[in-house]
A protein has these predicted regions:
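Extended, low-complexity, polar regulatory segments
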Residues: 1-26, 69-117, 377
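Reductase modules of NAD(P)H-dependent flavoproteins
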Residues: 5-35, 192, 273, 360, ...
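Membrane-embedded alpha-helical bundles of multi-pass integral membrane proteins
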Residues: 41-55, 95-306
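Non-transmembrane, juxtamembrane loop and terminal tail segments
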Residues: 76-112, 320-339, 406, 511, ...
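Classical protein tyrosine phosphatase
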Residues: 162-163, 191-212, 439-470
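Membrane-proximal cytosolic interface modules of multi-pass membrane proteins
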Residues: 247, 253, 257, 262, ...
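Ferredoxin-reductase
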Residues: 322-412, 474
Length: 639
């Protein structure tokens, strides 16, 4: 198909047209609006867009299949007592590892102002490169071979952008569903796809703006805009769809989501259906086949909702029962006993609802337990902020106060569960060395992985030789949240012959950090107390965040005087961790690929990301030096 339309007819021009004559002006306007051939071309470019999307998804799916098969092969080799099962053995696997290492070094880094507004976050370099490629691809489709001469020049640009805009809608919905084909094929979590979902919406807005602008500018060239708006319904339905689309994009900006998330979800859904209706009314009768790009996302959305509804009904046909426990640091520990939800992937999360604290409200919560732990109960650790978590915290505190006055059995509440979701990261049991890093309640993510590894190591041989667990907390009392779990996991791992080291960095506890100079040196603390508590010091140099005895504090876990009474299996350190020397030492000792998981505030995950990428480059991973690969999975606190 010749999509240039060159040579099909002479260019439209206004010679001999008297625009003061309304009949002649209207006839010329109809010639400008004659899009019978332009619609065919636009449809072809919309299909070309989807050909490109399918190719990208296909490539990502192939890499995902290779990744999953490689991890499964490692575990099978370890079960057969093969040594260095997490190390690529042949030239094919080494070549794949080299390409993977290069891609990770580019994709992992992230530069975002950690001290800025909570809602302002810059994506990772990998996401930025993907978005730039996406933008370039769409703009090439919009402007390539589209220089139609004459009076229909801007009409051609507008029609092309309209087709490309409507072609974005199915992709928009595919990236929004919690159960979606793209996530299944590529092994990408809903949270990561949701970032792309928002950027596809922005691309849709950009294309709609180009469509609106070029059409109106084309009419203005001949003074016909007023005539078009007064004689055609298309501009009015178009401005309605555009206004709704603009609001959809504005309301998804982080400040709006942070302000009232529950309201955002409801209005977002209602507004989206308003956009679909307005878009259907706007699509011209000359291109009714373009509505297939609207019908498809409607079907996809309903399929996602049907699957979610069926799963929700199954989960809650026999509702779970939740018991609550108030803990230090304004944290509530929730334990849910459910006969329906009995299996999940480590690191998965659910939308948890306890009707007693807000009917119809649900809160995303990472499952801190593993299916093999806590008698198959789901355990959550929620920090009290506002809304649901604040209601739960206040209630459990008041209940605890009343229990002190009179002994009563723990009260249980009906708990409704939507999920579990997530957990698309690689299986950490397939790595030679595992590093689990978390901050505050981000420990729920790493703890579930730790408990799963401990259980599996006690029942089978795994590729894992060494494990480092790092937890950054503000107050030493927070350790009690999971002290029993850490003690049990440490025992299981050591019994299985896995080298373990548990390091807990306490950043903001005066009682812990305010001891003598000799004690500081013995425990590895290097915070200058004259500047205030450790958490108040702005550490600009990453090297300055590591305790003086970095090798001792990051080495095998020992029972120090500072940890006997709270967590005997861990080393407690006052200050912040410096990840470069710690990771470098672990990678030096690794005999195969290292898996790193990090969950916590943006500053923590960003530091680990950038350090991992830098170390991989400096060590020339899989580039002939013998240095083994580094896999990183990062989870951030976000909505």
């Amino acid at each position: 198909m010749d999509m240039s339309m060159s040579g099909s007819s002479a260019p439209l021009n206004d010679s001999g047209v008297d625009f003061s004559n309304e009949t002649q002006a209207f006839d010329f306007l109809q010639l400008i609006l004659d899009d019978s051939e332009l619609q065919v071309v636009g449809n072809a470019y919309a299909r070309a867009f989807w050909y490109g999307i399918v190719v990208v998804i296909g490539i990502a799916a192939i890499f995902n299949i290779i990744r999953v098969m490689t991890l499964k092969l490692r575990i099978r080799m370890a079960a057969k007592k093969h040594v260095q099962s997490a190390r690529p053995k042949n030239i094919v696997m080494r070549s794949i590892a080299t390409v993977t290492a290069l891609g990770r070094e580019i994709a992992y880094p992230r530069i975002s102002p950690a001290s800025g507004p909570a809602w302002f976050k810059v994506p990772t370099f990998g996401t930025i490169l993907l978005l730039l490629a996406y933008l370039a691809f769409v703009l090439v489709l919009e402007f390539s071979n589209d220089d139609v001469p004459g009076g229909q020049h801007y009409t051609a640009l507008g029609i092309r952008s309209a087709w490309l805009a409507v072609a974005q809608v199915p992709l928009l919905i595919l990236l929004a569903g919690k159960y979606n084909l793209i996530g299944l094929l590529t092994g990408t979590s809903y949270a990561r796809l949701n970032v792309l979902h928002r950027w596809v919406a922005r691309m849709l807005l950009l294309l709609a703006t180009i469509h609106f602008g070029t059409q109106n500018y084309g009419w203005d060239q001949y003074g016909l805009r007023k005539l078009e708006w007064s004689t055609d319904t298309c501009p009015r339905t178009g401005i309605a769809a555009y206004a709704i689309l603009l609001w959809l994009n504005l309301s998804t900006l982080a400040p709006f989501r942070y302000f009232a998330y529950e309201f955002f979800v409801v209005q977002h859904l209602v507004t989206f259906f308003g956009f679909i209706i307005a878009a259907m009314m706007h699509l011209p009768s000359t291109a009714l086949y373009s509505r297939v790009y609207i019908y498809i996302p409607i079907v996809l959305w309903f399929l996602d909702r049907v699957v979610r509804s069926l799963r929700y009904f199954y989960n809650n046909v026999r509702p779970g029962r939740a018991t609550l426990e108030a803990m230090d640091g304004d944290v509530t520990r929730i334990r849910v006993t459910s006969k329906q939800v009995t299996s999940w992937v480590p690191g998965a999360y659910v939308l948890l609802s306890i009707p007693a604290f807000g009917f119809g409200q649900s809160h995303p919560a990472t499952i801190a337990s593993a299916p093999s732990s806590h008698s198959n109960d789901l355990v959550f650790i929620l920090k009290g902020h506002r809304g649901f978590t604040n209601h739960v915290l206040k209630s459990v505190k008041s209940s605890a106060a009343s229990k002190m006055e009179e002994e009563t059995p723990p009260k249980s509440y009906v708990a409704l569960i939507d999920g579990p979701y997530g957990g698309q990261h690689s299986d950490f049991a397939a790595f030679d060395t595992v590093v689990l890093i978390s901050g505050s309640t981000g420990v729920t993510f790493t703890l579930s992985i730790l408990l799963d590894l401990a259980h599996r190591a006690s029942t089978q041989s795994l590729p894992v030789r060494a494990l480092e667990f790092i937890w950054v907390v503000k107050d030493i009392s927070w350790i009690r949240w999971i002290s029993d779990e850490l003690t049990a996991a440490n025992h299981q791992l050591r019994t299985a012959g896995i080298e373990t080291a548990f390091s807990i960095f306490v950043t903001c506890d005066n009682n812990f950090s305010n001891f003598s100079t000799d004690e500081d040196k013995a425990s590895g603390c290097q915070c200058d107390k004259s500047l205030g508590p450790c958490c108040c010091i702005d550490v600009a140099d990453d090297e300055g965040m590591m305790p003086t005895k970095s090798e001792e504090s990051a080495g095998p876990a020992v029972c120090s005087d500072r940890s006997d009474n709270i967590l005997p299996c861990a080393t407690l350190i006052s200050g912040r961790p410096s990840f470069k020397p710690l990771l470098w030492r672990l990678l030096d000792d690794a005999e195969g690929e290292t898996g790193i998981a990090v969950c916590g505030p943006l500053g923590l995950s960003m530091s680990v990301r950038n350090t991992t990428s830098a170390i991989s480059d400096e060590r020339a991973v899989h580039k002939g030096t013998g240095a083994q690969g580094i896999y990183l999975h990062a989870e951030d606190f976000s909505l």
